[in-house]
UniProtKB/Swiss-Prot annotation:
Superkingdom: Bacteria
Keywords: Ribonucleoprotein, Ribosomal protein
NCBIfam families (alphabetical): S21p
Disordered, as annotated region: 37-70
GO molecular function: structural constituent of ribosome
Gene: rpsU3
A Pfam cross-reference name: Ribosomal_S21
Assigned protein family: Belongs to the bacterial ribosomal protein bS21 family.
Protein name per the record: Small ribosomal subunit protein bS21C
Length: 70
């Protein structure tokens, strides 16, 4: 459960922003959206595999030296 302590003389908007940020850090919103509808295990594996491949490609691209522009 995510909780925040409201500081004295703190505007509600600032406290709400801190609360939203803390929820995003915990991954609660992402998990909630994932659980709104059922995803078949094969579809879930396929999605996770595609994400892993994309991460790997991005990592390889970043590790390569930049192309020469001449």
């Amino acid at each position: 459960m995510t909780t925040i302590v409201l500081n004295p003389n703190e505007p509600v908007e600032v406290a709400l922003r801190r609360f939203r940020r803390s929820i995003e850090r915990t991954g609660l919103i992402k998990e909630l959206r994932a659980r709104t509808s059922y995803e078949k295990p094969t579809t879930e594996r396929k999605r996770k595999k595609a994400a892993a491949v994309a991460r790997l490609r991005k990592q390889v691209r970043r590790s390569m030296p930049p192309k020469k522009k001449y």
